[in-house]
């Protein structure tokens, strides 16, 4: 079983770190675990409701987050820091791209007899 909840806060790190940890890190993890996951295995990636608080990806961006080779993912034009407004936008983009990536990887995992899903919890009020 894989539960991927790793990530960094948009209030604590720069755009590049968010994309590297939250997007690239997830892509590497899904790819590597996907190669060895046993039949009956299960994976869950935690998204965030904020990925739905931004406009849809533009048509030319399409399925690129799902289909671009992992090592080229951070080279996509729309993921360059100069094309991202701020750290919150970077966080939202990373999570939205992860949603597309998980959807594509779920097909690959399924070929091995494993399941992969993502969940996006809503807002939870905490003392922080």
Residue map of PLM features:
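Short, conserved SAM-binding segment of the class I
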Residues: 28-32
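A hydrophobic alpha-helix adjacent to the NAD(P)-binding/active-site core of NAD(P)-dependent oxidoreductases
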Residues: 18-19
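Catalytic loop of short-chain dehydrogenase/reductase
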Residues: 7-12, 35, 39-113, 121-126
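Alpha-helical elements of the RecA-like P-loop NTPase motor core of helicases
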Residues: 27, 126-127
